[in-house]
Amino acid sequence: MDDYVGIMPLDELKAFTDRTYEIMMEKDPQPNEIGIFRQMAAARKEWIANGMPLFWIERMAREFREYFTYGVMEETPFKLSNTYPSVGRYLLIRMYSIGQKVFVNLTEAAMGQALPVHIHEHPAMNRLRELQSMIIAIQNDFASIRKELATDNETLNIILVVMHEYKISLEEAIVESLKIHDDMVREIDSITVCLPDFGFYQKMVEDYIYHVKIMIHGLNAFYYESGTKRYTQEGFAIPKYGTANEQSLDVEIKYIEHEYWIKNLKNNEHKYIGKT
């Protein structure tokens, strides 16, 4: 979905956001509307048929809207001006634009039960989901860096944002970005070893958190093991709103800790020094 809406004009994106919310709130699409709306309606009906409660459906609708409003729309000014956000602002935006605040809810659908509202909204649970989103966003940025170094107009990647704000080399930015990632992983572990007492729901919460962590591992494995070209220079989206100007970049990038990055990506750092 992010490829479809990521370079959509803001007026169209606003209408798309409103229509998404309506459909998730049980207003069926018209036969002539795009397939993504019909798929959303079909998914919503399947979730309801499988016993997911209305408050969970409403949460999905709300968090889809936040994905567009606080994620995709917040990225647009930086894309249009080809400028960098600060590291702090970037992480806030990416926490939404990565889409995980929406899709982490599917953990409950897979479990066949929704967390009660008072548990879902507990500060510890909210923080776990925020951390999960930002960790996955950073992992996504590492997986995408080879593709994004192949174009001259990409600024929304944690490595490039860190490099720009701290005025350091690409090699140093990779190391610093890994530190940010690892600090968040440690924070998740620190919270989960000292959970609040949720009483009757404690086992459900522990199962939920287990699957939240599995999503982090699973998505990171997908980036490198699925064979997708989504994260290579062949993976640029070229919808009606944009064009592709990517260049060939013969750099192999593996897992997040792979030293091959530092040796090979350093050759490309000159492209990003001085961009404001």
Located regions from the model:
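Alpha-helical, largely C-terminal catalytic domains
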Residues: 1-276
